[in-house]
Amino acid sequence: ALPMIDILLKNFENPDEVRKFEKGKFELVKLPSMTIGRATYKPGWKWSDDISPLSGTDFCEVEHLGMVISGSATVDFQDGKIHTVKSGDIFYVSSKPHDSWVLGDEEYVSIHFLGAEDYAD
């Protein structure tokens, strides 16, 4: 059992784990009851190109809850409609297979409160 903790401070400048891949990285900070992730993707990053080979699935099958810090990206459920998430947006994405890619020439940064543990693992 964990000792009672009144406050626990973590910082992405000193993450507990970093998963690096082509055109980006995923940093994790681990708390007793949850893991929070910070995704940083360079322009040109695409899930199906950069993460698919690491995950063994064609598209992302992780459920997400997060917030976009900067830049913008897509969520594509392969059903014809492509959704856009941009700076300031809070997003929920189901585990239904989806692709994603960075839009434009700005780095995309997002924080993940759900699904971080399983991402790019």
Task: Outline where the language-model segments fall.
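Ligand-binding loop in jelly-roll beta-barrel domains
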Residues: 94-120
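Short beta-strand segments
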Residues: 37, 81-83, 109
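A short, N-terminal "cap"/entry segment at the start of jelly-roll beta-barrel domains
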Residues: 1-40, 48
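Conserved short histidine dyad/triad with adjacent acidic residue
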Residues: 38-59, 95
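Glycine- and acidic-residue-biased ligand/ion/polar-headgroup-sensing regions
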Residues: 34, 54-79
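Short acidic-glycine-tyrosine-enriched beta hairpin
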Residues: 78-96
